Amino acid sequence: MAHPNEEIARSATEAISKGDMEGFLSFHTDDTVVHFPGRGPMAGDHRGKDGVAKMFQQQMQLLDAPPEIENHDIVAGDDHTVVLNKTRATRGGKMLEQNQVVVMHIEGGKIAEVWLHFSDQQAMDELASS
């Protein structure tokens, strides 16, 4: 039987792929924090549901469509869940495909903090900044 935090991570990831901001935010605590690495326009610590919503909206404005996320594995425990996936994002007709590691801290059935790690951070920064 899968750990309940695995389903939270899977559902949150599916919401991103559908461009469903409300669905995505429903899996987060009110004081959630998303750490987006790099030097691109989305880089930084996005705090609270309002901050994460702004990041999500910015992502939707930058990309031609919501990113396609293919989860390879989800390892869930009581406090942390790790998602290994392949992400495809397109901007201006240019597609970037790369592996991603997402670490989530989950409290009381909600995502409290997220750390994103891209296999090619420079390519991600270039896509977001082009």
Regions found by a protein language model. Give the residues of each.
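Short, low-complexity N-terminal intrinsically disordered segments enriched in polar/charged residues
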Residues: 1-30, 110, 125-130
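A solvent-exposed, acidic/Ser-Thr-rich amphipathic alpha-helical stretch
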Residues: 25, 29-79
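A short, polar/proline- and glycine-enriched secondary-structure boundary/capping micro-motif
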Residues: 45, 93-96, 122-128
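Short, cysteine-centered beta-strand-loop-beta hairpins and adjacent loop/turn segments enriched
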Residues: 64, 89-97
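Short, surface-exposed coil-to-beta transition loops
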Residues: 68-69, 96-102
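A short hydrophobic beta-strand element
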Residues: 77-87
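Short beta-strand edge/turn micro-motifs at domain boundaries
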Residues: 103-125
